[in-house]
A protein has these predicted regions:
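C-terminal binding/interaction regions
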Residues: 4-11, 21, 26-50, 59, ...
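Alpha-helical support elements that line or immediately flank enzyme active sites
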Residues: 97-108
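Structured beta-strand/loop patches that form or line metal/cofactor-binding pockets in enzymes
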Residues: 41-85
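Short, thiol/selenol-centered motifs that function as redox-active sites or metal-ligating centers
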Residues: 88-97
Length: 150
């Protein structure tokens, strides 16, 4: 399983531009699919990818229809979400929603994060999500809610 995950992430990394100022391969085509430039930036952002070990909190969500999955891990220090990271396999929208969720949660006090309107926080960051990609938002919301369950 670990080797499978490494292969998935290395393939994903090959599809991204890493040089500052360069656009994502196929960016024009992605915009034509209804993805906002902000969503594409979150898809391309590696700053919160990965898994925290050890993690104080962890949640997982999977979409059995399309096979997308998401794992959130978090470190809690002084009742605050000090770090939030994600591992995901899925479409462009699933990766972008996961990255936006991790950014929205990181640094917030636990109680504020637990009460946060996750849907609004994600949509505020990615600006626009095509209707056909609603499953990606639901995946992130499910993992986000589970992070706060006992």
């Amino acid at each position: 399983m670990k080797q499978f995950l490494r292969n998935c992430f290395s393939l994903s990394a090959q599809n991204r531009s890493t040089a500052e100022g360069r656009e994502l391969t196929g960016n024009v085509r992605m915009k034509n699919l209804g993805f906002s430039p902000q969503l594409l930036r979150y898809f391309d952002d590696n700053s919160r990818r990965g898994r925290l070990e050890p993690a104080d909190r962890q949640s997982e969500a999977e979409n059995p229809v399309c096979g997308d999955w998401l794992v959130l891990t978090a470190r809690v220090e002084n009742q605050q979400l000090a770090q939030v990271r994600f591992q995901a396999r899925g479409c462009v929208a699933a990766m972008a929603c996961a990255a936006a969720l991790a950014e929205a949660l990181e640094g917030l006090p636990w109680e504020q994060a637990d009460g946060l309107d996750l849907r609004a926080a994600i949509l505020q960051r990615i600006e626009r999500l095509p209707e056909a990609s609603g499953h990606a938002l639901e995946l992130a919301l499910t993992a986000g809610r589970k992070l706060f369950q006992n």
